[in-house]
């Protein structure tokens, strides 16, 4: 049986969500990268999430986990290219449970990131995985779901959550 490493999510008002996170330093790590990956993955799964960034659990690192098979943990990611085509789709965030809003994002991205084993990869992602990764990037850049949608869509999402309880 695997040990539960999951953590509590920070509140939407926590200032860490507004900070540009620091690079994860593999040469002098503040915590083991494999352990951090497991913490993020377990917390994401426990909360039925699709993406979870370190600041959402109170850690100031440029790291996030994305639901995939297997789960991807991206350290110090950089989006190196995006398609010019952008579409609106509904998104949610573990930071704002129950709020669903429309967000316009590129459909295809190329991203360079480091894995927990310190290997660097550059990969292309499309569709929903691309969108989850862009959400993770926002989170480590101090940008929340509320920041990437229009005020109209935000208000509609809040109203719908209240209506649905």
Located regions from the model:
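Positively charged
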Residues: 1-165
């Amino acid at each position: 049986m695997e040990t539960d490493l999951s953590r509590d999510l920070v509140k939407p008002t926590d200032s860490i969500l507004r900070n540009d996170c620091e690079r994860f330093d593999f040469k002098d790590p503040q915590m083991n990268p494999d352990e951090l990956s497991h913490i993020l993955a377990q917390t994401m799964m426990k909360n039925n999430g699709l993406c979870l960034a370190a600041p959402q659990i109170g850690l100031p690192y440029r790291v996030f986990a994305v639901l995939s098979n297997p789960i991807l943990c991206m350290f110090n990611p950089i989006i190196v290219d995006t398609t010019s085509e952008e579409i609106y789709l509904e998104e949610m965030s573990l930071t704002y449970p129950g709020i669903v809003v429309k967000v316009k994002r590129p459909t295809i991205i190329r991203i360079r990131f480091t894995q927990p084993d310190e290997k660097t990869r550059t990969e292309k992602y499309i569709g929903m995985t691309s969108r989850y990764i862009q959400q993770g990037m926002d989170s480590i850049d101090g940008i929340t779901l509320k920041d990437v949608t229009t005020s109209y869509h935000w208000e509609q999402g809040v109203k719908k959550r209240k209506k649905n309880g």
